[in-house]
UniProtKB/Swiss-Prot annotation:
Keyword field contains Ribosomal protein: yes
Species per Swiss-Prot/TrEMBL record: Acinetobacter baylyi (strain ATCC 33305 / BD413 / ADP1)
Keywords: Ribonucleoprotein, Ribosomal protein
Stated family: Belongs to the bacterial ribosomal protein bL35 family.
GO biological process, one term: translation
Keyword Ribosomal protein: yes
Name the UniProt record assigns to this protein: Large ribosomal subunit protein bL35
InterPro entries tied to this protein: Ribosomal_bL35, Ribosomal_bL35-like, Ribosomal_bL35_CS, Ribosomal_bL35_sf
Record GO terms (molecular function): structural constituent of ribosome
NCBIfam families (UniProt xref): rpmI_bact (TIGR00001)
Example of a GO cellular component annotation carried by this entry: cytosolic large ribosomal subunit
Signal peptide, first to last residue: none
Length: 64
């Protein structure tokens, strides 16, 4: 059987942990002036990938 290919874009966006995959928050790149300081602060850091998206991420990154 052929080797599975890793989706390189997904490999750069997700990191594997013991409990699943972690990812960065969205909506924090540009157009930040209209967003409150509280909202920008809450978008800081990483969050875990939702359970319903886990199979998709596993399929895109079989070796991570």
């Amino acid at each position: 059987m052929a080797k599975l290919k890793t989706r390189r874009g997904a490999a750069k966006r997700f990191k594997a942990t013991a409990n699943g995959f972690k990812r960065k928050q969205a909506f924090k790149r540009h157009i930040l002036t209209k967003k409150s300081a509280k909202r920008i602060r809450q978008l800081r850091g990483c969050v875990m990938v939702h359970v319903s998206d886990m199979n998709s991420v596993r399929r895109m990154c079989p070796y991570i």
